[in-house]
């Protein structure tokens, strides 16, 4: 197997494994729009990375984490509804990123690769970044699984039981930010949340427990990655969108199957 294809497969599979349980929380807590806002802000992180001459991956990670903290702070202090606030920040950060990039005449940037991913162009450094970020998020999810689940099921009861609800909510948002940052190279900023939401939504119909849903979402994500890479290899289609198309097909198939 060619090195670039092996790197793409390892990166895609690692992201699919972590997107399963994390995407389940996104679906349960109806945080899809939050994920969209962070993914749009990732392009601003890319632009600032080039402007400040730092690694785009590092700039995107710092940018997504900073925006997640800003969102939580604004939600607590502003009278605006959450969806209104997200609706303002999502297009604003994406547009600002595009404007900043337009001023960089001396920097050659493949904008399509950042918007829709360039999985087959992953380098050794990119792979290490993706594997490390995915492993960290999986480890933290394993540690925080029960408390996060308790907060998701009933926040008031979790608060009565002494769980740090605000801290856990912030932790979940930061984990989403990390995954979005590492996933940008795979499916691009415009398609990142689809890899979080679609497998989890497909698994939700047929799972009998939260753990079953998380595992099912991971397996569906792995299937979508393998199918998307195969389509890209044999039909010369873009890898990121091909993965999302395969995930969408799996979701449609889940609708056709009887609900458990």
Report each predicted region and the residues it spans.
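Loop-to-transmembrane alpha-helix initiation sites
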Residues: 8, 56-64, 83-87, 131, ...
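Short loop segments and helix-boundary regions at transmembrane helix junctions
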Residues: 24-107, 203-216, 232-235, 258-259
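Transmembrane helix-bundle core of multi-pass membrane transporters
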Residues: 6-7, 78, 86-146, 174
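Small-residue-rich segments of transmembrane alpha-helices in multi-pass membrane proteins
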Residues: 41-51, 89-101, 121, 165-177, ...
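Transmembrane alpha-helical segments in multi-pass inner-membrane proteins
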Residues: 190-241
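Helix-loop-helix "hairpin" substructures at the membrane interface of multi-pass membrane proteins
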Residues: 127-199
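Membrane-interfacial amphipathic/re-entrant helices at transmembrane-helix boundaries
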Residues: 1-17
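C-terminal binding/interaction regions
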Residues: 1, 115, 119-120, 220-257
């Amino acid at each position: 197997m060619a090195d670039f294809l092996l790197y793409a497969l390892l990166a895609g599979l690692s992201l699919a494994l972590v997107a399963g349980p994390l995407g389940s929380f996104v679906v349960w807590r109806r945080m899809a729009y939050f994920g969209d806002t962070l993914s749009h802000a990732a392009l601003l992180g890319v632009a600032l990375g080039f402007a400040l001459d730092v690694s785009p991956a590092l700039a995107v990670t710092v940018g997504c984490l900073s925006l997640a903290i800003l969102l939580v702070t604004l939600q607590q202090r502003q009278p605006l509804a959450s969806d209104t606030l997200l609706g303002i920040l999502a297009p604003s950060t994406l547009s600002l990123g595009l404007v900043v990039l337009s001023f960089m005449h001396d920097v050659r940037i493949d904008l399509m690769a950042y918007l829709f991913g360039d999985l087959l162009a992953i380098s050794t450094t990119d792979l290490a970044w993706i594997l490390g970020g995915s492993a960290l998020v999986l480890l933290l999810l394993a540690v925080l699984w029960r408390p996060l689940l308790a907060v998701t099921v009933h926040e008031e009861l979790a608060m009565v039981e002494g769980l740090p609800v605000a801290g856990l909510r912030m932790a979940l948002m930061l984990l989403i930010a990390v995954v979005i940052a590492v996933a940008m190279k795979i499916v691009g900023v415009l398609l990142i949340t689809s890899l979080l939401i679609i497998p989890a939504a497909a698994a939700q119909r047929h799972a009998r427990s939260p753990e079953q849903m998380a595992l099912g979402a991971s397996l569906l994500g792995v299937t979508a990655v393998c199918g998307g890479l195969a389509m890209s290899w044999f039909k010369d289609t873009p890898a990121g969108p091909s993965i999302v198309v395969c995930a969408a097909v799996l979701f449609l198939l889940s609708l056709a199957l009887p609900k458990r």
